[in-house]
Amino acid sequence: MAIGEVYETYDAVGLAELVQRREVTPKELLDEALARVEALNPQLNAVVMLEEGVARRLIEEGLPEGPLKGVPFLLKDLGAEAIDFPSNNGSRLFANTRYGKDSSIYARLKAAGLVTFGRTTSPEGGVGPTTEAAVYGGPTRNPWNLDHTSGGSSGGAGAAVAAGIIPAAHGSDGGGSVRIPASSCGLFGFKATRARLPDGPYVGEGWAGMAIDGFLTRSVRDTAVLLDATHGPDLGAPYVAPPLEGTFLGALAPCERRLRVGFATTTLTGEPIHPECRAAVEKAARLLESFGHIVEEALPHADTPGMMAAWTKIVACGSALSLDGTVRRRGRPLEEGEVEPIALSAAAYGRTISGAEYLESINKVHAYGREMAAFFERYDILLTATLAEPPALIGRFNHTSDDYVDYRMGPGRVFAYSPFTAAFNASGQPAASVPLHWTADGLPVGIHLAAAYGHDEMLLGLCARFEEAAPWFQRRPPVTLQAVRS
């Protein structure tokens, strides 16, 4: 089989099946992925810190007999600590950081048989809806339109998967960082219930429990298999998610249950959204009705502005901890240009927040979760857009601002652009971005679905129903290997 001719026609599960049937080898898949990096990355700036030698050694030593044996894979350059894969964490300050132990999430991905060969770009500190970190020498671009962002903070993962370099990639999500790139790049992105995936051993929880690992994929079943391979608490986890009824893959089977769906064509606080985003929500609502579900307009009665202010404080405290801890450990102050202005501003703001204010912010986030839970007493699903606009132009959300609070909460800034996703990091509920709509200019627009805490399986099954009714897998962006070679 000439794998290069058909590589993009398979998802990760499909490629693993080819390996299992010995129609292709892991080495051939790795060679193809590396060739695609060489051909496409100069335009996208999505893949960094290649470790080809490590990947070839993994294959030569014998891959585990996991469900994704032989499939090429990339880790986000933020978290997913691994002995064989140093990281920059999106920052010059942390460039080429090495680890003495594999993180639990990477150990499970490795056991699944994946062949990791590098990392994907992330904004510094994972803060922002775009990926334009100085450490990478330029922005990461969207394969659907190179003038637009691929999203953030898992923007490199989104661009790499959308362009067909790999079928699936690791990401993480503390305020929408899997779902925003999914919406921006025409992919599926799922944020699981809080603590569904392991955080250890390097942290007990990320951003007071708001952050979690995840994946960018072109098919719902790839996400299901990746979740099945990685979910569950690791040693010493401070708390665990509610148990599953079965498996994530099993949850994709048809379900006859009639759901009650609330939907909004505005933000959670009633502001208008872009007409293309509104059109995506209306299309999804019609599809849900055609599935036989009860669909009506509804908004949660929750203090979203208060949650956003609390989120902003918690993340700022995390920035201060990260920067100050690094300076203390190395024994010398920051040098000019080591850290971008927005991260410096976030850390400075974090230092002004007292311990009592930090705990008050956590209490606010928890109260918000209870307010959202009340909505899900009546409804099974909340449908909105993923973003309030189509993917932003490069430069709009770069990290040159020295006012972190305005960057997050000012008019037209991050929370105005992405007013939905962080709500479910705060509440801990499962949520997903589904690629249901494209603008007249050919830019992807995702719809956002959220379910009650712990109801991951029901939500994933509904996403699979959308995939069946409105397939997106064969939609390919202008920047692909075929386009580059033609």
Residue ranges and their predicted role:
Residues 23-31, 60, 247-250, 273-300, ...:
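Acyltransferase
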Residues 55-134:
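Acidic/His- and Gly-rich active-site-bordering loop/insert found
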